[in-house]
Amino acid sequence: RLCRQYRAKLGDAHPGDIRTLDDVRKLPFTTTEDLRAGYPLPLLSVPDTEVLRVHASSGTTGKRKVLAYTRNDIDTFAFQMARCYELAGLTPADRMQVAVGYGLWTAGAGFQLGCEKFGALTIPVGPGNLDIHLQLLQDFGTT
């Protein structure tokens, strides 16, 4: 039952069939329609009781596209975002002010998870309210 969509798309393909870059190009992509078809929890490869969080698109072009996150997904997401900060030259001594949106979309949560995993002071302000941003920037020395 789990991830029937992938099983159907991949057909008889097996990991051993992928030997070259050209073989990878033959694999089907996950499309917007794939995500919408399984709404509200599309493309699960675990029981839905293992889903800890969902994020979704705004739904402006149709049904929302939902991404379901397990504990492992959240941990991996935090690690990837922390790695981005490291590669950008930041250090845990930096103070990061998260100015992107929080809510259904994944941006705010992802930036915050990454900051915390990275070990930097995190100030989750969100978008807008320039006065608060400026005050916190001055008060905390946001880098």
List each model region and its residues.
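Conserved adenylate-forming
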Residues: 5-8, 109-143
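General N-terminal targeting signals
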Residues: 41, 52, 83-86, 107, ...
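Conserved AMP-binding loop of ANL adenylate-forming enzymes
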Residues: 86-122
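Nucleotide 5′-phosphate-binding alpha/beta core
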Residues: 1-56, 61-79, 83-87, 91-93
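Short acidic, glycine/Ser/Thr-rich loop/turn "cap" segments at secondary-structure junctions
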Residues: 62-69, 93-100, 134-137, 142
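Loop/helix-junction capping segments adjacent to catalytic residues or to phosphate/diphosphate-binding pockets
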Residues: 75, 105-106, 131
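Alpha-helix capping and helix-loop boundary segments enriched in small/acidic/polar residues
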Residues: 72, 102, 124-128
